[in-house]
């Protein structure tokens, strides 16, 4: 499964609405962020492995700054997990694949 790119304009539909049926993990990132580049491929793997359990989406904070501001994103990478149309959990910083999977499973 491909990681979906989202923006301020489609955040409501792609994240809030979809999370009512399937949890959505949003990775807030930027091109210049080294740790963001490290977890990008990891999130793609997780997207494939957990495609029936969670949708993985990416939001570029430099190109689309309104949504990160709304959710108080101060450092990246930051991952927000939405379920049932609401923010369920937050994880800040790069970490291992197994830690991300455990975090997802704990919160879905």
Residue ranges and their predicted role:
Residues 33-36, 79:
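The canonical Cys-X-X-Cys-His
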Residues 27-29, 81:
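Structural cue for short, hydrophobic secondary-structure segments
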Residues 5-24:
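A short beta-strand-turn-helix
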Residues 22, 29-32, 75:
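Short pre-active-site segment immediately N-terminal to redox-active cysteine/selenocysteine motifs
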Residues 75, 80-108:
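Non-catalytic, surface beta->alpha helical segment in thiol-disulfide oxidoreductase systems
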Residues 1-3:
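N-proximal helix/coil linker or "cap" segments that precede and/or mark the start of modular domains
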Residues 12-14, 64-67:
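Short loop/turn elements that flank and shape the SAM/SAH-binding pocket of Class I
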Residues 5-7, 28, 39-65:
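Thiol-based oxidoreductase modules, predominantly thioredoxin-like and allied folds used
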């Amino acid at each position: 499964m491909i990681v979906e790119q989202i923006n301020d304009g489609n955040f409501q539909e792609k994240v809030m609405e979809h999370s009512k049926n399937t949890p959505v993990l949003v990775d807030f990132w930027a091109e210049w962020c080294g740790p963001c580049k490290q977890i990008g491929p990891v999130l793609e793997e997780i997207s494939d492995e957990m495609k029936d359990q969670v949708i993985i989406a990416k939001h570029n904070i430099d190109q689309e700054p309104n949504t990160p501001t709304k959710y108080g994103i101060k450092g990246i990478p930051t991952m927000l997990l939405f379920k049932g149309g609401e923010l369920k959990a937050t994880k800040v910083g790069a970490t291992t694949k197994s830690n991300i999977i455990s975090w997802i499973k704990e919160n879905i």
